[in-house]
Amino acid sequence: MSLQRIVRVSLEHPTSAVCVAGVETIVDIYGAVPEGTDMFEVYGTPGVDIYVSPSMERSRERADTRRWCFNKGLEIIVIMNSPSNDLNDSHVQIAYHSSREHLPLAYAVLYLTCVDITLDCDMNCADRQDRSFVDKRQWVWGPDGYGAILLVNCDRDNVDSNAQDNCDQYVRCLQDLEDMSVMVLRTQGPEALFEDHRLILHTSSCDAERARVFHVCGPEDSCESYKCVLGPDRMSYEVPRLKGYEERFFVEGLSFPDAGFPGLISFHVTLLDDSNEDFSETPIFTDTAVFRVAPWIMTPSTLPPLEVYVCRVRNNTCFVEAVEELARKAGCKLTICPQAENRNDRWIQDEMELGYVQAPHKTLPVVFDSPRNGELQGFPYKRILGLDFGYVTREPKDSSVSGLDSFGNLEVSPPVVANGKEYPLGRILIGGNLPGSRGRRVTQVVRNFLHAQKVQPLVELFVDWLAVGHVDEFLSFVPAPDGKGFRLLLASPGACFRLFQEKQKWGHGRSLLFEGVIGDRRVQTVSINQILNNQSLINFNKFAQSCIDWNREVLKRELGLAEGDIIDIPQLFKTEKRKAVAFFPDLVNMLVLGKHLGIPKPFGPIINGRCCLEEKVRSLLEPLGLHCTFIDDFTPYHMLHGEVHCGTNVRREPFAFKWWHMVP
């Protein structure tokens, strides 16, 4: 609502004023007071509520029909709650009295015309328009909060277009309107009032760059009826009275929250008095509606899968077939990027992250395109952006990116509670270097974007010890039927050495790793005895374990985890240019499709006809109701320093929890 309006009355002639339903009007009686006045009466026609505040120290009281002492600091407050039928059809009369005179000294008359003006939108996030209980100038988080929500219209509903829907000032297809939020300007009052009063819809120059408003100026089933009235370089619009009582607008977001933009956008409608030809217009009333741009939200691996993505390259036919079978078991769609489009870039996890945006009226999947820009660079924009599938990207202006800017280094935890604070949408995990070091970090534009979304606060882990440098090289999350509903899997050199020592103790020291590997290059086998006698390998894995232990403590602290929430998965690393790479296929770098896990086949020592690494992993995960499928990724992925998770991507169901119910 606007602030109170002040109207001054005159003893020489009646005064006319416009008031807005439900908005207080202060009547200034000090400018025209007969000499000798020490009391006054004030009364009005039916429908006019009048209050008197005798002084700054006393609360207001109904004026009723009694006389009031004329004191310094008193106020007369007038409120009308229903719009007028005609101009000046209500009035307030003030009678000035002297205690020494029987009759009033003078009268002042204020004629009132009441209009009802509201800028309405979905304020309570329940898919209905309601303005009865909230301050539209505010946006409040939480289950009892309120505020309008705006989607960035970043999909491509028009099949004849090559651009996102919000890239121009036109509505190209009616389906595009489903991605927008409705804003309604309602006006009630005498039609004659608007002959010399104007309604202006306006916003700030900054907000005009972040949202676009379309006015419905004709039949709603015609794209030509939607006129762009606010947006870049358009900050104000005189609203014509096309439909009288109600004018409808559709609002689309142009920008996600980011550095310097917290996500709030305000629109205002102002009633201007243009009745005096000798003076400029004067504002009477302003109503405001505030929208928050919906954040981009990541989905953890514990949410149900909807669609799996994989690249077909020269030497991964069996891998693609295995992923296809796993997707079939999990009941989700499979999308294969052909070699002609990926040009042998198989790292589809690194190229993009699949998330969503949500408003009460619409949920929209949105792909976040990484700045790595390999041969898969065009795939998210050309093949995923489309009907009801949005797109966003962030790239540094100087084009300087590192391996940490690939999205294998971008994960999100399931919902957690840590240090007394709830994170109902989990926390984003990114990899970086140690505090104070000069190693690699995620580029600032990506960090700024992720931080600005607010609903999944960042946790930075230490990954600069890894050659590739991705968080998915040493951790993953799987669903669990008990406890927190998930387990954190951590790669563990210590667990692997303990397993091999146990097998050696039972006489299996000569059992070989890498037997049966088929590929373009011969892979030399190595025995358990050789591994346990390789002091250089042991020392390097002690270093790797210390790095993982550092991250373990960070994860326990920042995600509120106990040791019982963590499962150690046997894994060894080897050194390459002073950094770590997986010694055998990295078991935690898995594809999680509900209860079905696609795990890199480790080609571990065969004992009693079975791989002891596979058997150990099964013993850890199958009691949780999970089904382990070991996929041979050795030649097409492992030998290139990646695994199953690196070579796949998953679109998942959104959270059931609504982001606007949380308190960041």
Curated annotation (Swiss-Prot):
GO terms for molecular function: calcium ion binding; identical protein binding; protein-arginine deiminase activity. The keyword Transmembrane helix does not apply. It is an enzyme of class 3 (hydrolase). Epidermis and hair follicles. Keywords: Calcium, Cytoplasm, Hydrolase. Disruption phenotype: No visible phenotype. The skin of 7-week-old null mice appeared normal, but scanning electron microscopy revealed structural alterations in the whiskers and hair coat morphology. One of its GO terms (cellular component) is nucleoplasm. It is found in: Cytoplasm. Its cofactor is Ca(2+). It catalyses: L-arginyl-[protein] + H2O = L-citrullyl-[protein] + NH4(+). Its EC number is 3.5.3.15. Belongs to the protein arginine deiminase family. Catalyzes the deimination of arginine residues of proteins. This is Protein-arginine deiminase type-3. It comes from Mus musculus (Mouse).
